[in-house]
């Protein structure tokens, strides 16, 4: 794929560099969205488009020694999930199916109890 569309804050580096890309650009965007949902900010925030591009290509994502105290309450599994999604190398960035095997997802899924829903009777329509 080579067509580039989207919001700059969520674009993977390969899109910005106008390189061929795969569905892993969506994994990158998922990482940005997850970061934003957990912190209230995007990881590459700026009011300047060139600075956004620079941040996406080069800014190191860190959760330690920051003024953002909200990361203190976020699990290491969640942080690892974000870092894997935001791998700048699309060849080593995980696929969606690989993400489903990560501890942040599997630990959550294992803790969930499924509800025993009653079977619904099907009414005949006249």
Question: Residue locations for each model-derived region?
Answer:
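Conserved catalytic-loop aspartate of Hanks-type protein kinases
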Residues: 26
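Activation segment
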Residues: 18-22
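Conserved activation segment of eukaryotic-like protein kinases, specifically the C-terminal portion
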Residues: 1-11
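Terminal C-lobe "cap" of eukaryotic-type protein kinase domains
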Residues: 88-92, 97-112
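Structural helix C-cap motif within protein kinase domains
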Residues: 39-42
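Short proline-rich PxxP-based motifs
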Residues: 58-71
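Conserved C-terminal C-lobe helix
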Residues: 73-85
């Amino acid at each position: 794929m080579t067509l580039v569309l989207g919001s700059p804050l969520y674009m993977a580096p390969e899109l910005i560099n106008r390189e061929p890309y795969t569905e892993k650009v969506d994994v990158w965007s998922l990482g940005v969205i997850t970061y934003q949902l957990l912190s209230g900010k995007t990881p590459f925030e700026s009011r300047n488009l060139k600075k956004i591009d620079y941040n996406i290509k080069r800014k190191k994502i860190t959760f330690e020694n920051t003024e953002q105290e909200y990361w203190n309450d976020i699990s290491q599994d969640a942080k690892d999930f974000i870092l894997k999604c935001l791998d700048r190398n699309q060849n080593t960035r995980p696929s969606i199916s690989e993400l489903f095997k990560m501890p942040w997802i599997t630990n959550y899924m294992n803790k969930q109890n499924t509800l025993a829903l009653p079977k619904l009777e099907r009414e005949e329509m006249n």
